[in-house]
C-alpha cells in the first residue's frame, strides 16, 4: 500500500522510525525497482547544525526541505554521490529523513548492473552486501539522481509503500559523518533495523 501524504506530515523522528521496514519504489524504464528501508537519519533544520537548513536557512538547494511533506530531496555530495531524503512535517518546517541504507527486494539484477556494471551472479558476497548499504550506494543501485529532486512520493514514478513487514527491533544511535555539527553530533537521530546485513555500519 502506497503511503499517503499524511504519513509524512508528522514529527520527523516519528516518521523516521516508521519508515523502517517500508519499501522505497522507483520505476525505471518500465521496471519496478524496490528495496526495504533498513537505516535512516533525521534532520530538523530549526535546531540541527547537521542539517542543510539549519536555523531555517532557505537556499535554492534547501527550499524543498521547507515543504510540503512527502517529496524527495536529492542532493550531491563530494561532487559524485547522491543522497535521497524524504521531506517531513507541515509546509514551512525545514525537516527531512535521509535514507541511509536499503535491502533489495525487486530488480536486484538491474541494481547490480547500475552499481557494478555486471550481472548479480558475478558478484561476490561482499559486493552483494555492499550493493545498497549506504546513501550513495543505494542511489546508484536504484538510479536515483538530482533529476528526482522534488519528486512527489505520492506520485506514480517513485513512492514508499507498506507491506506489513514489522517483525524487527529498532536500534537508536548517533548519526554518521557530521563531525562539523557541534552539539548536534550527539543527537540520537539515526535509526536502523537490528542485525540487518545491509546497514551501513553498526
From Swiss-Prot:
Signal peptide: none annotated. This is Putative 3-methyladenine DNA glycosylase. The keyword Metal-binding does not apply. InterPro entries: Formyl_transferase-like_C_sf, MPG, MPG_sf. NCBIfam families: 3mg (TIGR00567), PRK00802.1-1 (NF002001), PRK00802.1-3 (NF002003). It comes from the Bacteria. Keywords: DNA damage, DNA repair, Hydrolase. The keyword DNA damage applies. It holds the Pfam family Pur_DNA_glyco. GO terms for biological process: base-excision repair. GO terms for molecular function: alkylbase DNA N-glycosylase activity; DNA binding. PANTHER family: DNA-3-METHYLADENINE GLYCOSYLASE. Its EC number is 3.2.2.-. Belongs to the DNA glycosylase MPG family. It comes from Alkaliphilus oremlandii (strain OhILAs) (Clostridium oremlandii (strain OhILAs)).
